[in-house]
């Protein structure tokens, strides 16, 4: 891990974040601590220029608006055009049709390299379903169910899928047997706002 951080710092990638307004300052500081250079441009009018010079694009739908979604769409198109990696954090996707419709249309239009969400959020996208109770809602599922869901998402969208929770699951373009898990997550992470957002900001 130390070797990875040193390589990251030596490269100092520029990461464009259109992220949750609740945690935007924390995201910038975490990326700086990891050796990246964050930029938080949000105006649709500058998306092509900003995204075009970046090394990664981090999208988070946690605080949506028409303007922010339009900015994300423009940025994602530019990232896809230039083969810039895209991370999509599905925060609260099942809470409203507004969020769901945007995510589904974006996934239809561009290839996303990493999809990240809790179990309820990934399930909502796979099943096109609602989840009530806010952005922190998580379903309970055993290990095989969570792994199967992660693999379904990875296979459907041709990407890496990360399901976060008490145990994290990471699936690639693979069979279920190739889904990896990490059970070193802390339950305390669910007691503080934005810990999942912080995690997705480091995935570039």
Which residue stretches match the model-derived regions?
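Conserved phosphate/ATP/ADP-binding segment of small-molecule kinases
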Residues: 98-178
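Conserved N-terminal subdomain of the carbohydrate kinase-like
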Residues: 2-88
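General beta-strand structural signal in soluble alpha/beta enzymes
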Residues: 17, 39-41, 86-90, 114-119, ...
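Short pre-catalytic strand/loop immediately N-terminal to key active-site residues, enriched for Gly-Thr
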Residues: 179-195
């Amino acid at each position: 891990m130390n070797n990875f951080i040193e390589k990251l710092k030596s490269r100092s990638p520029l990461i464009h974040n259109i992220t949750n307004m609740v945690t935007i300052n924390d995201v910038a500081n975490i990326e700086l601590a990891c050796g990246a250079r964050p930029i938080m441009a949000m105006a649709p009018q500058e998306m092509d220029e900003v995204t075009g010079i970046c090394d990664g694009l981090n999208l988070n739908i946690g605080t949506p608006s028409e303007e922010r979604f339009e900015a994300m769409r423009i940025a994602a198109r530019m990232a896809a055009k230039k083969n810039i990696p895209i991370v999509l954090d599905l925060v609260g996707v099942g809470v409203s049709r507004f969020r769901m419709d945007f995510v589904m249309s974006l996934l239809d239009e561009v290839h996303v390299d990493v999809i990240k969400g809790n179990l309820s959020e990934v399930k909502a996208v796979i099943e096109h379903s609602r989840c009530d109770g806010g952005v922190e809602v998580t379903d309970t599922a055993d290990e095989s169910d969570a792994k199967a869901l992660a693999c379904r998402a990875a296979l459907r969208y041709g990407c890496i899928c990360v399901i976060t929770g008490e145990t994290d699951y990471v699936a690639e373009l693979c069979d279920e047997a190739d889904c990896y898990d990490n059970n070193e997550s802390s339950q305390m992470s669910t007691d503080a706002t934005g810990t999942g957002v912080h995690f997705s900001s480091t995935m570039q």
